[in-house]
From Swiss-Prot:
This is Serine/threonine-protein kinase VPS15. It comes from Arabidopsis thaliana (Mouse-ear cress). SMART domains: S_TKc, WD40. It is found in: Cytoplasm; Golgi apparatus, trans-Golgi network membrane; Endosome membrane. Serine/threonine-protein kinase required for cytoplasm to vacuole transport (Cvt) and autophagy as a part of the autophagy-specific VPS34 PI3-kinase complex I. Required for pollen development and germination, probably via the modulation of phosphatidylinositol 3-phosphate (PI3P) formation and vacuolar organization. The lineage of its organism: Eukaryota, Viridiplantae, Streptophyta, Embryophyta, Tracheophyta.
Amino acid sequence: MGNKIARTTQVSATEYYLHDLPSSYNLVLKEVLGRGRFLKSIQCKHDEGLVVVKVYFKRGDSIDLREYERRLVKIKDVFLSLEHPHVWPFQFWQETDKAAYLVRQYFYSNLHDRLSTRPFLSLVEKKWLAFQLLLAVKQCHEKDICHGDIKCENVLLTSWNWLYLADFASFKPTYIPYDDPSDFSFFFDTRGQRLCYLAPERFYEHGGETQVAQDAPLKPSMDIFAVGCVIAELFLEGQPLFELAQLLAYRRGQHDPSQHLEKIPDPGIRKMILHMIQLEPEARLSAEDYLQNYVGVVFPNYFSPFLHTLYCCWNPLPSDMRVATCQGIFQEILKKMMENKSGDEIGVDSPVTSNPMNASTVQETFANHKLNSSKDLIRNTVNSKDEIFYSISDALKKNRHPFLKKITMDDLGTLMSLYDSRSDTYGTPFLPVEGNMRCEGMVLIASMLCSCIRNIKLPHLRREAILLLRSCSLYIDDDDRLQRVLPYVVALLSDPTAIVRCAAMETLCDILPLVRDFPPSDAKIFPEYIFPMLSMLPEDTEESVRICYASNIAKLALTAYGFLIHSFQLSDVGVLNELNSQQISTTPASETPSHLQKANGNAQLQQLRKTIAEVVQELVMGPKQTPNVRRALLQDIGELCFFFGQRQSNDFLLPILPAFLNDRDEQLRSVFFEKIVYVCFFVGQRSVEEYLLPYIDQALSDQTEAVIVNALECLSTLCKSSFLRKRALLQMIECVYPLLCYPSQWVRRAVVTFIAASSECLGAVDSYAFIAPVIRSYLSRLPASIASEEGLLSCLKPPVTREVVYRIFEKTRNPEFMAKQRKMWYSSSPQSKDWESVDLFDKDAGELNSVECRAEQKQSVEGKKQIKSASKQPEVQGKYAEKDAKLRIPRNPRPNASNTVELRDPVYPEKLQFSGFMAPYVSGANSFIEPENIPLYSFSMDKRAATNPPVASESSLQMNSLGMGSLSVPWMDSMSKSFNLASSVPVPKLISGSFHVGTNPKQFYRVVHEPESRENDQISSAISKFQDLGVSSSSKSASVTSEDASSPADLVGEPSLSRTSVPDSGWKPRGVLVAHLQEHRSAVNDIATSSDHSFFVSASDDSTVKVWDSRKLEKDISFRSRLTYHLEGSRGMCTTMLRNSTQVVVGASDGVIHMFSIDHISRGLGNVVEKYSGIVDIKKKDVKEGALVSLLNYTADSLSGPMVMYSTQNCGIHLWDTRSDLDAWTLKANPEEGYVSSLVTSPCGNWFVSGSSRGVLTLWDLRFRVPVNSWQYPIICPIEKMCLCFLPPSVSVSTTMKPLIYVAAGCNEVSLWNAEGGSCHQVLRVANYENETDVSEFQWKLPSNKVNPKPNHRQNMSSKYRIEELNEPPPRLPGIRSLLPLPGGDLLTGGTDLKIRRWDYSSPERSYCICGPSLKGVGNDDFYELKTNTGVQFVQETKRRPLATKLTAKAVLAAAATDTAGCHRDSVQSLASVKLNQRLLISSSRDGAIKVWK
């Protein structure tokens, strides 16, 4: 082609480049790459991918291009025989009349572009590319082909650093004129920058006739010179070695490039480059000689044959197989790369020696891991994942935080001494990194993994690739970690597979602590890059990802803190290179926080802590928190405290601790008390005594032994560290010592350890003054030293059953007992302390075990006298012997009718009355006690509860044994709170743990805030409330009737009662409107209140469930709901709240039960809810039986978990265990009787009554799960609502034993039924103005119509199943829609006449209307007539003055719309009550309004 081509003229525009090319090539112009004068380079789209097209336009004289085409064919054919080529010739060419085209595959990157692209090439990568470039030239020269135009643009690179030499210039002239730069510019200066890579001998003198043929063949030495220039530019960070003028001067000997090469630090590289660019061509070596001579000097030994052969095997494999094979031979790769290091560098005494590995050995090793059995390889990849990473670094084996401070108990003392109060920090979190872990070759493996990680199809192989990157990161430098590996790891945080996201999270947290040196531009990598990318993980759909994030948040926090400290150091020093990783790691921890004194530094630290605090709060209290997530977060709570500092730990970590204990998960509570000791040291002594000790105190009564032991170990650690003051220590000893008789040896040993540590902390004198009198009753003898664990263990009395331990435990928490104990401690006569303690314990033990003793004695009076005389022996030895005997008695209580309560404590009857258990023993009702005389469907309590009377402070325990919490009883609130305050410290108390009797533990967790000064007031107010109920407070003549005793338990299973506690006796709402809540857009079908009355929820037809803060009902003018839960388009039919918890259960019209928890934070005195955090623990159950019709709490002593009974539209009745998420049992109602529209269950859980949509009421025996009685309501109509009837104390015991229920059905009436016989006792009728023809009284006189359970097959199917209702459903009769029972048989009702009435059972004439529309000209002058007919009592509401005109429903609605008192304007659907400063009535209506009355 020669100089003739140089005379061509300017050609057409680029739009016509492909105009002359045949359409069969299917090329589409995409981009113009180069506008050189000789060839135009364009990028085109082809069916097989992107291609580069070099275009030569023909102009002027015609030139024969066949010779150049022959050379292209030769080059292509020769290189086809290469097995693993580093050359890439032109693949296609085409000549047309106007142009010639050269086509090859497009490569994304060439060496020129790669040198200026992040991440910049590391030193070993540059050596690897130089090595491959020499290999490429060697392959060319071995085939007698010279390139002719080697430059950076013609060196192509793949993403995994495989090099190709392309664009062979067989058509360019070999020699060009020395004194005419036009030819150089035309052929070789494509960028116009005058860079020259040509050998000096390719320039000739232009004077006269030339002595050199321009088309003479190229020589290998010319390519070697160009290779030297490219390698020099590679190691000079893209700076060219020669420009044209410099090369010509160098040819004349007027330029020395060695000065420019001095910028290359490696002398071996400089020597090799200088040898390649010698002026004498003969002095230059061949490419093969350079490869051999500079092995070990420039090129590492493992480059050839090991690494090159490995890459040759990887090239043809897909990404998945590359990762799989890399995983299989990773250890061999690491071993080979570390071989050329000296013993000092790798941390051993002598250099590592190994057998040389040639190419065949490498291929054999690779083949052993390749596709002989690809499935086995992939399976081995999964099985051996741990061997890869954990066999590399001992540091990662031994410690979860290998390069960060791991907070242990041994280090806490030293750490506390480093605290800087001004900056609230504890020093730098980084630990030194060992220098012998550097292996530069790992960068090449990391680059290969990064190149294919996005194209891996199998998720487990993507995970393996991330783990391999984590392994490689141990051996590469900081810049490669941040610039090369980190972006790929962060990108995989959004991978669709959970295991990949987890692996990316773990790898991220393991890589970042390794970084010790980074440029100032990366100082804000955490706030601007890391944390935003992690923001979606707390709401990840997979729990495993959230657990992984929670377990690593402490690592992230400490690492971000270390980065922040280093950025301050960089700003102080000013020059990055002056700080290396060794200086950072050896900086004294006490000096590092001095940089945080700057205002900017403090602001950044506060912002960082705020960011981490938000993440922690989202994980702990967010909508997707689980016990496993919380447990993972607790594992590193010490590191989080280290990060937050003392002030932030108090301000942020302490308030969220109750959220951990509000969880039911036993393992979570166990881990909490295992790790809380770290929090104690960081928050300080005052916070421990005021906030954390009450938590530990309540953990001692937990049913899980691991929780108790961990709490005791925490106390022991605090004692050994002298962390507790004397007063706090004595208070904890008060709480702990009853556990000395715990049946588990594990717990007893933990108690002994704590007592011994306390003794050692107090000293010998105080130990015998304070500890010995308390524990003496539990020891057979006093040991020589209380501080000796072995001595205490050898002196312990035999253990007792767990029930007895909890009774003793609760007895010791009685304020009276604690007052006696403290009075004994601080008495002026120390010699009497021991004996007073013995007397005190005798009295307590006797009271606690009197029932057990009586149950095991015979019925004779002599036996009682023996017990009483034995308990009153004055001799100390006799007392000890009695205590030993009582503690050893096996607990097999059997009820005995003749047993009575022996009362030695003058206030003991009151205590029994408080707990609701006095009646079975003093009322003489043998039907409670005698097994053979127990009625089938009575209100009797569990036999186990009846034979084990409680102690005074056992209110919450006994309420739970009945299947209810003490907070479920409104009039028990103040008493139960005061009795549960076990410590005299006036700080928030946590009622946590599981008090239980027998086999029915009930767990509840609630923070109780009460001032100490109010305890006596609360007790006295509780006594006065019980006296108001008619309960005598005398000690001997207490006469409590059965209905009083059972009334607390009556809350169980009653639909409205289980949702809203039974209001106070004598409570008479006046109808004063307190609040009007109008957020629902449709009917509010049901209301449920929490056990502590702090909030209530409402379920509506508008597909929402709203949470309302009842504590602000009387305070806020603009009252709004706090939280809203959406039912996904279905209507909320019914709702209830599980007792002593914040869990809400909602039944929807689409047959789905929704259960969720309301997360809130309580602070200050009075347990005031400060913030509602959100709705958590969402659980859904699709019953697949149509709409949920009725829903209520069901709790019985024989059941361990919270149960929910519900009925469905398809006639199903189910009992759902909310813990196991399974149905305990399922019953089916008869379809001909209609679906079950209402349910009511007994307090003891032995029976329940169902009411159907066709007026059939059925009594079910739950012991055998069969219907035992069924009767038809006098009118065939739906049973709207049912509730239990709590009769007054004046009614005889025989009447109270009957299952009496109120039934709202029919037209404007409520009836009282005895479900045992199906007989009606009372009918309450509302005045019916629109239809004066009331139902005849005759139908109530008739005996109940028994429903035959056997179907009559002769009966017409249409009448049996009422098929006509499918065409036209029967209209609902106007009447009562909601019931709320009151003590003494009183009742609140609400219905379609928009009125709420209070019915008085004892004095029906005192019944009255609480609220309702005031009718014009009528007034609220209703009176209530009482009539009795054949045993049925009728209470009829009538007007004192007859109406002048007939009153219609439209007139009632018009009157309601103009009512000044604010009555309901539509049917009253639900009633509930809450007890705050005063009791309030809550009502909801069909128009979506909720009203609160007082």
